[in-house]
């Protein structure tokens, strides 16, 4: 199944590549900043691990014909949506690096010396990626009812993700958000669009009930966010591709930073990390139980167990 999923993810990537090339060819004027924006969308949508597209294809399973094409379209759509969120998130978080390369706002800022211009181009590039996701889905030629339901899934996910991002911003200015509030923003900004939406889209493509994936997605997403929060607080650049300790330096409220105190001794920090890792492992335990209860093909459940194992490895990296 792993090789088959890789092949299907690559088909989704090729859809994105072709769509973005066509879109760039339709740019009516020659403008360096337009080139910057389109290049940024391509860099983010075509690079990375393509976890979300992979989840679409895992949930769809070994489908063929029209169902396989629908899964390929949905995988491409979610990759473009992910690119949009990443570009905007880097602006919000003032991150100058992503995946080990400069972010779009930092590229433009460094070249022009204009901070605001870099921010403006990045915001516009994120808008381009969002619009590309919706246009690709609308123009894919899928049946109308399938397209309508897919639009509902991705727009509902986008709405909740934006809400979670706004809560995250609020936590940066409001003193001492509770772990419960941070957990809520994490669930909204990560579990919904990174796990629930892809798994629902894959189920939709295969013609299976989409609501069955909600609980699994929440637990996998919770564990994934735990691993990401640990990496953001103590991860090294070589592994994360981002500035080490960025969440601490920027004062972001995460599951790690709300537990940290600058006066911590090394053994205290170790205990904080262990506590947060345990939270992630609890999510994975529940996720595996829920996966076992799903009424899905074995290839789908095996793929989901594989995702849980992958997240577990991310947690072990920090143990």
Model-derived segments and spans:
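Short glycine/serine- and small hydrophobic-enriched flexible loop segments
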Residues: 57-61, 86, 131-139, 199-204, ...
């Amino acid at each position: 199944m792993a090789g088959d999923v890789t092949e299907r993810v690559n088909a989704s990537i090729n859809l994105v590549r072709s769509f973005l090339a066509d879109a760039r060819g339709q740019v009516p004027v020659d403008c360096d900043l337009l080139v910057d924006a389109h290049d940024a969308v391509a860099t983010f949508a075509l690079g990375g691990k393509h976890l979300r597209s992979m989840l679409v294809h895992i949930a769809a399973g070994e489908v063929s014909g029209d169902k396989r094409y629908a899964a390929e379209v949905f995988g491409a759509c979610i990759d473009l949506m992910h690119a949009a969120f990443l570009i905007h998130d880097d602006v919000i978080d003032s991150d100058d690096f992503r995946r080990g390369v400069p972010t779009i706002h930092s590229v433009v800022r460094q070249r022009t010396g204009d901070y605001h211009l870099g921010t403006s181009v990045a915001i516009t590039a994120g808008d381009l990626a969002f619009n590309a996701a919706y246009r690709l889905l609308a123009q894919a030629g899928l049946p109308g009812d399938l397209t309508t339901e897919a639009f509902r899934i991705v727009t509902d996910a986008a709405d909740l993700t934006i809400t979670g991002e706004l809560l995250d911003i609020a936590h940066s200015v409001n003193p001492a958000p509770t772990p419960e509030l941070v957990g809520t923003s994490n669930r909204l900004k990560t579990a919904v669009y990174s796990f629930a939406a892809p798994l629902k889209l894959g189920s939709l493509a295969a013609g299976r009930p989409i609501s069955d994936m909600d609980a699994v997605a929440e637990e996998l997403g919770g564990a994934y966010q735990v691993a990401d929060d640990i990496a953001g607080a103590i991860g090294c650049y070589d592994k994360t591709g981002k500035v080490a300790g960025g969440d601490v330096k920027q004062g972001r409220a995460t599951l790690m930073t709300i537990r940290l105190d600058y006066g911590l001794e090394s053994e205290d920090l170790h205990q904080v990390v262990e506590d947060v890792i345990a939270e992630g492992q609890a999510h994975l335990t529940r996720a595996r139980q829920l996966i076992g209860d799903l009424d899905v093909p074995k290839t789908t459940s095996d793929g989901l167990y594989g995702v849980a194992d992958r997240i577990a490895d991310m947690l072990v990296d920090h143990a």
